[in-house]
Structures are given as structure tokens and as C-alpha cells.
Amino acid sequence: MYVFIRANNPRPTFLVDMTTEERAAMQRHVAYWTEKAAQGIAIVFGPVADPKGVWGMGVYRVDDLAHMQRMLDADPARHILTYDAFEMPRGVLGPGEPGVHPFP
């Protein structure tokens, strides 16, 4: 199954005014999800340039929602970010991506 995650920053100005501790946690956060991408779990993730304030997004290939929650709980930035998770009942992947699930 696929899950869309919206990662909410603690404030709209977060990307430009992170504390030293927040920046270090976010560097570990990127490394953590980059490892998940190398494992084929994270399909795409990164910041979204919303004019109201930047937030993060990701699409993940997981066994179930509990699997996704375990990964979110282990995220090094868990104490900074909040998450909204949405199951994607179906998805179409581009050529070369394993597991294409076309709409009926």
C-alpha cells in the first residue's frame, strides 16, 4: 500500500529560522528518509513551497498503516514535526517503478 504524509513544521518561518538543534534534527531526518528511499520504501519526499509556509511531503510504500506509524515514530525530527497520514487506495506509478496499480 502507499501512504501520503504531510509533515507540518512548527512555524511558517521554520526553514529560515531553525535553531541549531532543529537544524541538526532536520539533517538526521533527511538522512533517515534517504535511507528509506534507498530501501524502496520512500518513493518521493521533500519540502513543498507553499506560499503560506513550507511543509514537507512524502509518498511511501508500506505494509500497512502500523508500518508507517513505526517509521514516523522513529523519525529523528518527530519532536519537531507533526504528521498527517493518508492512505492511497490506488496509485499509478511511472514507467520503471515496480508495483504499478492502475485505476479500474
What do the predicted segments below correspond to?
Residues 1-104:
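Conserved, structured core segments of small domains
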